[in-house]
Amino acid sequence: MLFRSMLEKPEDILRKFKKAMTDSDACVRFDPENKPGVSNLMQIYSVATGRDYAAIEAEFAGQGYGSFKTAVGESVVELLRPIREETERLLADKSYLESVYRAGAEKAAYVANRTLSKVYKKVGFLAR
């Protein structure tokens, strides 16, 4: 199974695409029934680049799977780059993360105390 995390290093994403399962026929052609691996890669490439299947087939005509898998991997790396960069920026800002944690903890405590007060009233305990 080919798994990609949106936050993986670009070289890891490329390596996984290069290992993607394809068939022995080296023709890049959309045929989900007979070429499911290649067809899946074509779907990914189409989403990442906006190209239709006919354009993809024409682009890689006669090239084999090696260059196609590399192109798919590179297009996914570029598609995910803004997400990865923003995540890295946010994770590097410790004061921002602490403020988010603190705000979340305060909200959770408020909601928990309201719920606990309702439970105390229903059960008949004295309010805290």
What is each of the regions a protein language model found here?
Residues 3-128:
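Conserved nucleotide- and phosphate/pyrophosphate-binding catalytic cores
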